[in-house]
């Protein structure tokens, strides 16, 4: 992360998580109802690390431990236009949710819990408000974990289960955004 953007650096936490899925027993009732992924290329430059790979190698071709003198220092660090990304999320979010699960663009309806990626507290509140979802039905971890990028969704799911909020039989929507600008979401019964 580029230090001139220290205000953004304070949003990021650190974590790793995974979910292990198995076939539910016939009496359990757990189920994956819907899944969807979409990418909007106009947001490609909003969250990126331009360096690395073969285009802008970070390390010297002769010595992989030495910095490449031809490399652009700034290109090797994460860059984010948070306000621009949030604008694009709000522009496309309702349509994405409607395509994921009809009715989600207006309310949670039969969904018990929202388990969102949490880029920031402000972004989380703006998204919930735009979708008409009550904040008390969203599992919130941004205040304790920070933005753990892709790990934030399974970490937040775990927190919801461990705290006793999410129980067997609850229908949940898990969703997030990422570089690209990409959206991903699933609706499941836990």
What name fits each language-model region?
Residues 5-91, 95, 177, 190:
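Condensing-enzyme catalytic core mediating Claisen C-C bond formation in acyl metabolism
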Residues 90, 94, 101, 109-190:
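Claisen-condensing/thiolase-fold acyl-transfer catalytic domains that form or cleave C-C bonds
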């Amino acid at each position: 992360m580029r230090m001139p953007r220290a205000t953004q650096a304070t949003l990021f936490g650190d974590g790793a998580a995974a979910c292990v899925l198995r076939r539910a027993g016939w009496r359990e009732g757990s189920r994956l109802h819907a899944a969807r992924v979409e990418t909007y290329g106009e947001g490609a430059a909003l969250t990126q690390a331009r360096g690395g790979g073969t285009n802008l190698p970070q390390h010297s071709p002769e010595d992989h431990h030495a910095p490449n003198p031809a490399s652009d220092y700034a290109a090797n660090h994460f860059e984010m236009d948070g306000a621009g990304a949030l604008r694009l999320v709000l522009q496309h979010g309702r349509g994405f949710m409607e395509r994921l699960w009809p009715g989600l663009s207006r309310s949670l309806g039969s969904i018990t819990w929202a388990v969102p990626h949490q880029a920031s507290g402000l972004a989380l509140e703006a998204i919930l408000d735009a979708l008409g979802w009550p904040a008390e039905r969203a599992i919130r971890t941004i205040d304790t974990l920070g933005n753990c990028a892709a790990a934030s969704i399974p970490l937040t799911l775990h927190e919801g289960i461990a705290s006793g909020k999410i129980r067997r039989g609850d229908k949940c929507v898990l969703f997030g955004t990422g570089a690209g600008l990409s959206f991903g979401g699933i609706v499941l019964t836990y």
